[in-house]
Regions:
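A glycine- and Lys/Arg-enriched "phosphate-lid" helix/loop adjacent to the NTP-binding pocket
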Residues: 122-169
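NTP-dependent small-molecule kinase module
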Residues: 168-208
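Conserved lysine of the Walker
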Residues: 18
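Hydrophobic anchor at the beta1->P-loop junction of P-loop NTPases
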Residues: 10
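Short beta-strand-centered segment that lines the nucleotide-binding/catalytic pocket of NTP-utilizing
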Residues: 29-47
């Protein structure tokens, strides 16, 4: 048993539709929804250099240093949220939420190795992994405020780097999930969001 058995976990790579799908589920079933992306700012303020050395280095980088000047392998290795920094704060937040109803948590910060100890039933967690084409299309349709690569001196190179970095991250998620007995669901755009949301609802045992 886990003290977080009332939580349903949706992790995965960027551009897979995690936010869209979990909002559909939250609206459909009246669930509390926790976005790990939305808490990055607040959690960053609580993390120091000792707790989060990768984050400390990331803070000091310019936009070009983050997204243009380094190769994707280095970008993956140096991105704090891909390596569990601040994950303990997510767990702290979840434990402060009501336990008498289901909570849906979503975001790329949910790493299989870190989530697994908090999951009694593997069906309560899933990782959404976009295909390369779906990821690229998702990034290119992001609103201007979210297109951080546009704030570099070479947006085209920055986007290429980010897409390759995220491919590496997605591959690691698939590998780690399989090793931990957890499921990764590939998203290729061939199904509607409603169809995928229905599959997730069945998986999570959600009922109106």
């Amino acid at each position: 048993m886990s003290d977080l058995d009332h939580v349903r976990w949706v992790g995965g790579g960027s551009g897979a539709g995690k936010t869209t799908l979990t909002r559909l589920l939250a609206d459909r079933f009246g669930l509390d929804l926790y976005s790990t992306d939305a808490m990055i700012g607040a959690h960053s303020e609580r993390l120091g250099a000792t707790d989060a050395p990768l984050l400390e280095r990331f803070r000091r980088m310019s936009m070009d240093e983050r997204w243009v000047e380094h190769d994707p392998v280095t970008m993956y290795a140096s991105f704090p949220w891909f390596h569990g920094e601040g994950f303990n704060l997510l767990i702290e937040d979840l434990r402060q939420m009501p336990t008498d109803r289901l909570v849906l948590i979503e975001g790329f910060r949910l790493l299989p190795d870190l989530v697994r100890p908090h999951v009694s039933n593997p069906s309560n967690a899933v990782w959404l992994v976009p295909t390369a084409d779906f990821r690229r299309a998702a990034f290119k349709t992001r609103r201007e405020a979210d297109a951080f690569w546009m704030r570099t001196t070479d947006p085209a190179q920055a986007l290429r780097n980010v897409l390759e970095r995220d491919r590496l991250f997605s591959n690691k998620i698939v590998s780690d999930a399989a090793r931990r007995g957890l499921e990764a669901l590939h998203i290729d755009g061939q199904r509607t969001a409603d169809s995928v949301a229905t599959e997730l609802a069945l998986r999570f045992g959600l009922h109106r």
